[in-house]
């Protein structure tokens, strides 16, 4: 049982991958939020994905119980700390317990199974997604941008993304002449529109609302680099093995920075604590808390990331 949120669900894929490696003849059932069901579709050892569509009076848990109680489960992994894992027949179960430890979420998830090596997130791709990705993202250098987020407070201004794209793709830059692929969900077009409008039409690749999660991962796999807000898309890019730079403001990078050797992050001059403890902070507001992050440090962080890795040709 994993998250409703794309980012947390992506980060949990390492646990599933570990269990499937440890038990090579086993299959898995995954219960998750509707928005992340497609993430598990390409994994041929996941035989069922149950969408936990929230219902009144915890009806979604009752429905999941009726779908689960008739099976004896060898292992139950409950990352939502629900009562359900106690109410279905099982041999062993493992429950995630949230703590305030200053460690990455992947490390915390690994502790659920007592793992000394954190289970790196991964994505599963199938050939159909790879074929479609080749149609959507052309050969040659492509810079991927993720200008959206599930909350306005975490969004770096679209105008800053536009300036970043120009800086990184100008003559003599690290990605000189690259196309720019803009990713986001269908309902996020308004957030990305100023960026798309500012890019030359022969340079931009508009992928807003055109992909599910596996296809987005396949498209990202064809990009040289991803730069984006702290979001599920950022974690998807990192899990797909794409060099990934995450942008942080009102979220704690020690817990949610992109995971992997070819990743990095840059944050606002203000720390997470300074932002959320400010007198004018309101978590209900959609106002960006990322405006103090200038383009220059993001360019510098991108160049630093590129210098640490060898970008594919």
Pin down the residues of each PLM region.
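Catalytic machinery of carbohydrate-active enzymes
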Residues: 1-313
């Amino acid at each position: 049982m994993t998250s409703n949120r794309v980012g947390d669900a992506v980060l949990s894929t390492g646990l599933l991958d570990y269990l499937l490696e440890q038990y090579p003849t086993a299959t898995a059932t995954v219960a998750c939020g509707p928005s992340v069901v497609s993430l598990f579709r390409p994994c041929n050892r996941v035989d069922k994905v149950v969408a936990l569509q929230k219902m009144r009076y915890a009806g979604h848990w009752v429905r999941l119980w009726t779908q689960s109680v008739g099976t004896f489960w060898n292992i139950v992994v409950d990352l939502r700390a629900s009562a359900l894992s106690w109410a279905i027949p099982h041999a062993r179960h493992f429950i995630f317990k949230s703590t305030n430890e200053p460690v990455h979420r992947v490390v915390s998830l690994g502790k659920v199974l007592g793992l000394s090596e954190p289970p790196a997130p991964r994505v599963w791709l199938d050939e159909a997604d790879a074929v479609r990705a080749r149609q959507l993202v052309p050969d040659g250098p492509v810079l991927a941008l993720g200008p959206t987020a599930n909350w306005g407070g975490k969004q770096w201004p679209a105008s800053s993304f536009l300036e970043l794209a120009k800086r990184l793709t100008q003559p003599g830059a690290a990605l000189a002449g690259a196309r720019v692929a803009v990713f986001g969900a269908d309902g996020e077009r308004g957030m990305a529109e100023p960026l798309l409008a500012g890019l030359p039409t022969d340079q931009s690749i508009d992928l807003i609302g055109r992909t599910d999660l596996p296809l987005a991962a396949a498209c990202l796999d064809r990009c040289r680099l991803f730069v984006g807000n702290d979001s599920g898309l950022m974690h998807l890019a990192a899990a797909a093995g794409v060099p990934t730079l995450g942008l942080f403001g009102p979220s704690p990078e020690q817990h949610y920075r992109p995971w992997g050797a070819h990743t990095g992050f840059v944050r606002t001059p203000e720390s997470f604590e300074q932002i959320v403890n400010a007198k004018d902070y309101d978590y209900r507001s959609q106002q960006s808390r990322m405006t103090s992050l200038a383009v220059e440090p993001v360019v510098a962080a991108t160049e630093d990331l590129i210098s640490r890795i060898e970008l594919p040709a």
